[in-house]
Structures are given as C-alpha cells and as structure tokens.
C-alpha cells in the first residue's frame, strides 16, 4: 500500500468517528458516529425550526457502567452502555434559549431511539450563537422547460459522506453471508469502511478460555432510513448465522443510514 493510500485510509477511518453500541449488550450491533450523527442532524433540521445544530459528539455516559457484548466487538468499538450526546447549537431570539434547547433535546432523543435504537440517556446542549429570524422566501417562478417540454431536473442534494462500496465477497461462505444480509428488509447495500477498502464481510476465528474455537463474522452495511437501524441489524445477525452450517457468532456494523 502506498503512503498516499495509507493516509487516505487513515483519514477515512478517523472520519467514521467512534463505533457506538447499537441497542444493548445482546444485540451485537454497532454504528459509526458519523452515520448516527447524520441521522440526528437530519432530524434536527426537519423537526426543530429556528435551531441550527453545530458540533456534535456521542460517547458513553459512564465508561465504568458497561457490560460485555455477547459477540466480539469491531476493533476499537465502544462497549454497550448508556450514551451521552453533546452538541452545540444556534437559535433565533424569538423564544428563550432554554425553550429552543428543550425542543432540540426532544427531537434528538426521539431520533436516537426511534430511528436508530441508540441507548441515549443524556443530552448536553450548549448555545453558541444567535440566528436571524427566518424570513419566508418569495414565490419562485416555475423552472424553464427543456425542448422536450419537461422541467429541468435539479441537481441531487448533497448528503452525508457515503462509505466505500463493498467488493465482491471471496469464497462460498462470503457469498452466502452477502446474500443473506442483502435479503433482509432495510439493508440498502454492503459497505467496506472499517477493515480495509471494500471489505464488507470479515470472517475470523475466535477462541475463549474454555470454549472451542468458533468462527465470528462481522458485516458492514448501510440501512434504509425508513427502517430502525437496530431492528435491521438484529435481523441481519439472525439471517447470517442461519445461512452457514456452523452457525457462527455475528456482529453488524452500520456505516450509513440513507
């Protein structure tokens, strides 16, 4: 691997942020902080008018209060436990800042629980700026028609950074895992973000102190925003486990919600 490619890979993985526990210790699922933050930002933009979200971080509320997950976690992932969201925000002066903060807190808590399945127990907000009141924009003229008589299509809106697409799996088991995961409702695609460029399915052996060696599989994927991320992850774990004759342990890492 060249120095430039290595630098690019490191920057990409740093951009993912923390790997946050999704659900509880028995769910065997994680989500990147980048993906979770994008969902919270969309929720704030849609559900908290007059408020603009700034810097946002998600971390364990109490690192001492964390149970062991039921499956091996992805490298450097946080253990399951209650989470704290810390964010800066700006708001207009049409209402007291504590009122704006309360509205934003409710929106963030709802999105974390209902759209993702994060166990958020604390949300710390800090007001950093005042915004000018929003002025309704005047009606815009209809778009010009093309020669075909159809209105010109607008450019697609810029969204959150998308993870690298996954390469084709190698081997029969990799193919079986891929097919099982993609068949689950709510899975948009497999991604390759954490374990090297394009690797979405990771198969390895784990041995405990008393148990015999057992295979462990990690699947990286993107979920549909209309499905709760933790519910999709649970179904993927079950589908992948049942797709292989040795019924390995399975962990799921959600790298995007779109």
Predicted regions, residues:
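N-terminal, Lys/Arg- and Ser/Thr-rich interaction peptides
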Residues: 1-24, 153
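N-proximal, solvent-exposed amphipathic alpha-helical segments enriched in charged/polar residues
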Residues: 17-73, 166-206
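Short, non-transmembrane amphipathic alpha-helical segments
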Residues: 40, 44, 96-116, 226-248
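Short edge beta-strands and adjacent turn/loop segments
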Residues: 49-90, 124, 128-130, 189-222, ...
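Extended, hydrophobic interaction surfaces within ordered domains
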Residues: 82-137
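Surface-exposed beta-loop interaction hotspot
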Residues: 114-188
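C-terminal interaction module
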Residues: 175-178, 183-190, 203-220, 224, ...
């Amino acid at each position: 691997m060249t120095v430039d490619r290595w630098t690019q890979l490191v920057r990409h993985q740093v951009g993912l942020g923390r790997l946050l526990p999704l659900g509880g210790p028995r769910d065997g699922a994680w989500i990147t902080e980048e993906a979770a933050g994008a969902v919270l930002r969309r929720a704030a933009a849609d559900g908290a008018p007059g408020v603009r979200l700034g810097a946002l971080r998600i971390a364990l509320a109490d690192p001492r209060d964390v149970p062991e997950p039921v499956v091996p976690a992805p490298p450097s992932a946080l253990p399951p436990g209650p989470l704290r969201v810390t964010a800066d925000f700006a708001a207009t002066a049409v209402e007291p800042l504590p009122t704006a903060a309360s509205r934003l807190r409710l929106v963030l808590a709802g999105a974390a629980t209902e759209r993702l399945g994060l166990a958020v127990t604390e949300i710390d907000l800090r007001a950093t700026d005042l915004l000018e009141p929003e002025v309704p924009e005047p009606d815009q003229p209809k778009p010009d028609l093309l020669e075909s008589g159809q209105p010109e299509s607008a450019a697609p809106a810029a969204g959150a950074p998308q993870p690298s697409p996954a390469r084709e799996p190698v081997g029969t088991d990799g193919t079986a895992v891929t097919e099982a995961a993609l068949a689950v409702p709510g899975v948009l695609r497999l991604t390759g973000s954490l374990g090297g460029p394009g690797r979405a399915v990771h198969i390895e052996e784990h041995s405990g102190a008393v148990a015999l060696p057992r295979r462990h599989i990690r699947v990286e994927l993107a979920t549909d925003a209309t499905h709760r991320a933790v519910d999709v992850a649970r179904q993927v774990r079950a589908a992948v486990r049942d797709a292989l004759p040795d019924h390995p342990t399975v962990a799921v890492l959600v790298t995007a919600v779109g």
